[in-house]
């Protein structure tokens, strides 16, 4: 399953607020479709699937990528669910979003893909790069790059920068000091349900 490129509000109407996907809020709270208002009891599978879809759409990754992250999270010490969130939060496109360099994660991914971002002084165009403690993330020293990020920093997608990212806003540079703590994950998610969803699939 490839990365989603369709209407974003349709997704938020179905799954709820996804700050990484879009800033806009759905005007109608009921799910899309002819029977969006109908209330019916959902199965446990449907509930787990919905939580999994929240992660996919919020972080803008494909099913194949998410499966890889789940496998990697399992191999790490500690809670698989927490590890999974830390891995997703550590992606370069998400870090740029959390710093305010991009308006959303897709917007931040474009910044990275188009060569506007540097890591440790070198241009890096790999959005999935896993940022680690000690990395310096910055907007490239180029007028066009600075202008793009400047406008986004004035109106960041999220109000607060997580404490593991030390941002120097005037210089458009930041230092990564560790992993994102669970309480600073912006999306409302039950990661245990995601782990359960993949328990028999991966």
UniProtKB/Swiss-Prot annotation:
GO terms under biological process: ribosomal small subunit biogenesis; translation
GO molecular-function terms, A-Z: rRNA binding; structural constituent of ribosome
Xref: SMART domains: Ribosomal_S4 (SM01390), S4 (SM00363)
S4 RNA-binding domain mapped to chain residues: 90-152
Gene Ontology CC annotations of this record: small ribosomal subunit
InterPro entries with a match to the protein in the record: Ribosomal_uS4, Ribosomal_uS4_bac-type, Ribosomal_uS4_CS, Ribosomal_uS4_N, S4_RNA-bd, S4_RNA-bd_sf
Keywords of this entry: Ribonucleoprotein, Ribosomal protein, RNA-binding, rRNA-binding
Region named Disordered: 15-43
Family note: Belongs to the universal ribosomal protein uS4 family.
Oligomeric form and interacting partners: Part of the 30S ribosomal subunit. Contacts protein S5. The interaction surface between S4 and S5 is involved in control of translational fidelity.
Function: One of the primary rRNA binding proteins, it binds directly to 16S rRNA where it nucleates assembly of the body of the 30S subunit. With S5 and S12 plays an important role in translational accuracy.
Matching PANTHER family: 30S 40S RIBOSOMAL PROTEIN (PTHR11831), SMALL RIBOSOMAL SUBUNIT PROTEIN US4M (PTHR11831:SF4)
Protein name as catalogued: Small ribosomal subunit protein uS4
